Amino acid sequence: MAWLGIGMGRQIVPVLVFVAVLCSGVDASFNRYSFPKDFIFGTGSAAYQYEGAAKEGGKILNGDTGDVADDFYHRYKEDVNLLKDMNMDAFRFSISWSRILPNGTLSGGVNKEGVAFYNNLINEIIAKGMKPFVTIFHWDTPQALESKYGGFLSENIIKDYVDFAEVCFREFGDRVKFWATFNEPWTYCSQGYGTGIHALGRCSPYVSTSCAGGDSSREPYLAAHHVILAHATAVHLYRTKYQPTQHGQIGITAVSHWFVPYNDTAADRRVVQRSLDFMYGWFLDPIVHGDYPGTMRGWLGARLPAFTAEQAAAVRGSYDFIGVNYYTTYYAKSVPLPSSNRLSYDTDIRANTTGFRNGKPIGPQEFTPIFFNYPPGLRELLLYTKRRYNNPIIYVTENGIAEGNNKSLPITEALKDGHRIEFHSKHLQFVNHAIKNGVNVKGYFTWTFMDCFEWGDGYLDRFGLIYIDRLNNLKRYHKQSSYWIANFLKRKKY
């Protein structure tokens, strides 16, 4: 039905909002005015998942790649209009390192066309009354640097990353006021170098025979160490050279599950803390406190790189805000010590995490089966961040739910996503609870703006507020959730 398409969106907002609210059972009185006046609402994306114009072949489900993705590179003006239609305050996106520095290094030259694309995008976002939130690195290390010295396994990456970051600060920082150095380094390091299920696909042979080499007991920690040092060096550069005149903020985006003890025992309570330390504290403890969590140091010993006194001083306090990505909560249960000759990041945690206890899920299991819909977990993670990390400024930079890419489903049915409306409404209510309990949360970004390339799952998952028809020239359609959020964010006219 053509009237459900993007072009006619404004004409049917009231009807579909009414239908969506009725279907979801959400509280219509809960809206943007339930939050502090300066609270920022937005949605997010990532360069490789959206832009297209990538050339590397895929080695993931269905053989999918990001070569075309959502073709955001050519359609960004149309897409920024969609953001405006949803009354968003901000748009979160990442900058492709290779699009700016094709050879990965400053000496290899700056791609002026890449710089022009991001300048045009930033200008368009601002022209529509929104704020750009920019991630400098979202998992797309230039292949040239992987081939040259092994990417983040080498300390050489620090200088090249900071050179890339400086190009971004210099070219875009007069308009960009929110920078995140890295997105989810936990995912990049643990799954790229520990399990091999994400790029770069490295792991020990006893973890997976499909990995292209690696050491799951050491490489995740080495790569993470270089990420943290690169982050701190870039923050220092920004603070000393650009922040005094550009007046922006800089931080990092971490991801964490929330964890609940499987049994009410001291052992399982300890494993909850250990799980948080190995996932969340791995990055935030150094950045806030100057060193890795004691649980990591005590177990890993020499496998965990050490900060020099000078490095620790540089890393400590290297943030203006913390971005928090949250998707699920698990039960955590203690397990026996792992075999000393089959160590890996996963076995180092010494935990069994599951969404089920006595056959019952902790929350409804989602289409993405590793995720369980448990909104209180977001509140608990925010409260924990307040307690452990000195009540920092926080932006919830990702939170979302998917449905499957059912090609046999008529588009008119595929646009009915009441589950997403309920998901965001309930999670926002728990964010609101956290704020009322003193957590310094300043914003909330849905994942994601449009259905996109979801890394290892390719195009099987649809997380977007906007439906992408991959069988019809990537045509955009509003899902019901996009109308709901437009209504939720609608400003009063005085």
UniProtKB/Swiss-Prot annotation:
Keyword Hydrolase found: yes
Record-listed E.C. numbers: 3.2.1.21
Binding site for a beta-D-glucoside: Q49, H138, N183, E184, Y327, E398, W447, E454, W455, F463
Residues of this chain annotated as glycosylated in UniProt: N103, N263, N352, N406
Reaction catalyzed: Hydrolysis of terminal, non-reducing beta-D-glucosyl residues with release of beta-D-glucose
Pfam families on file: Glyco_hydro_1
Superkingdom classification of source: Eukaryota
Family to which the UniProt record says this protein belongs: Belongs to the glycosyl hydrolase 1 family.
Protein name: Beta-glucosidase 29
Record organism: Oryza sativa subsp. japonica (Rice)
Gene: BGLU29
